């Protein structure tokens, strides 16, 4: 947990819901460790024009052409924020190769779970 902190996923979702409510935002959560499920979800939301997508693609950042293609298509109509809890640029060399960054308006890395809250603040300020 050293790289990722101590907050469990259920608690994180509650905290994000509270933050979104305070900002008068609607948010939808989706999590999967299965590449195809992530791609299917991204493809299913392409109709939500002018929406924001906050994504922590984890290791798929460095490996998934399918996720890259889905985000490329999505980025034509929506804005994407990439969040990584740990600083992927200061970790292993293979993590320095980022397949999705070019489709993201901003990348927030190494800020712990606070990166998700920074993403909501960024959206709110736009």
Stretch-by-stretch model annotation:
Residues 50-89:
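Mid-chain, well-packed structural core segment of small domains
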Residues 21, 43-47, 72, 124:
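Residue-level signal for alpha-helix termini/capping positions
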Residues 28-29, 76, 89-126:
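Short, glycine-/small-residue-rich phosphate/pyrophosphate-handling segment
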Residues 16, 41-42, 67:
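Aromatic/hydrophobic pocket-lining residues that form π-stacking "cages" and hydrophobic walls in ligand
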Residues 3-4, 70-73, 99:
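Glycine-rich, phosphate-binding/catalytic loops in enzymes
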Residues 37-56:
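Short, electropositive alpha-helical surface patch
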Residues 26-36:
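Short beta->alpha junction loops
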């Amino acid at each position: 947990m050293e790289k990722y902190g101590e907050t469990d996923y259920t608690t994180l979702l509650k905290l994000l819901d509270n933050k979104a409510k305070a900002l008068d935002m609607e948010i939808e959560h989706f999590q999967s460790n299965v590449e195809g499920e992530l791609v299917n979800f991204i493809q299913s939301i392409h109709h939500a024009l002018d929406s924001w997508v906050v994504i922590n693609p984890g290791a798929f950042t460095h490996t998934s052409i399918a996720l890259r293609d889905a985000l490329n298509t999505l980025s034509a109509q929506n804005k994407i924020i990439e969040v990584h809890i740990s600083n992927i640029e200061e970790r292993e060399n293979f993590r320095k190769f980022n397949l999705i960054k070019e489709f993201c308006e901003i990348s927030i890395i190494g800020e712990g779970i606070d990166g998700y809250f920074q993403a909501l603040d960024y959206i709110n300020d736009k």
